[in-house]
């Protein structure tokens, strides 16, 4: 599940997302939202005259003990301060501080729509892509060098952090509005009612998973594959039942 992190009200600067550097961002002091498997690098300068902490401020009792204390030397552990803030959303408006994959948005060779849904199946929740569950979901079929565009639409009441293995993609639009300063990621958390348009170059031949990183949703069917023409995986399903992503 996603988490909301607070750095005790200290100003911090986001310097990287999903392994990609971000430059010259403005400092923030609010809650930082991070989705399953998302990576966000931050830098901050601490007040070394007092103890403070990095903590989860999720509305979830299971996260109450997600706290990392930061204790400068010779400081009493009880000297603790807290603040109440709102949240920072690093995907809200894209960013003007990243190196894009595409400086000019090209015409895609292949386009896919991914309607992300949820419904009751045979006694369990099913999480669907275009009303199908894996392995019945339609794969992305590409050849090396293709420019691929995908539109992700969340038609459910759940967040879906969608993760593409083996590739980075550029987020070119949110809710139908083109982004002037697209982000480059390998995971995008699509919230209920949201849509994103992403684009990537098929430049890493293989058989790759594209799935929701809320792993309950992936296990419930929200997964597909990116398959390169001419690539064969020797993987076989053994008696233990392990299946490839």
Predicted regions span which residues?
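Residues at beta-strand starts and edge strands
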Residues: 1, 38-40, 110, 146, ...
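Histidine- and aromatic-rich segments of cupredoxin/plastocyanin-like copper-binding domains
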Residues: 1-95, 174-186
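Generic intrinsically disordered, low-complexity segments enriched for polar/acidic and small residues
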Residues: 9, 49, 94, 99, ...
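Active-site pocket scaffolds in enzymes
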Residues: 14-29, 113-245
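Solvent-exposed loop and beta-edge segments used for protein-protein assembly and interaction
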Residues: 34-36, 46-48, 106-108, 142-144, ...
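Hard-cation-handling environments
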Residues: 57, 110-112
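Extracytoplasmic/periplasmic copper-protein system
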Residues: 65-109, 220-245
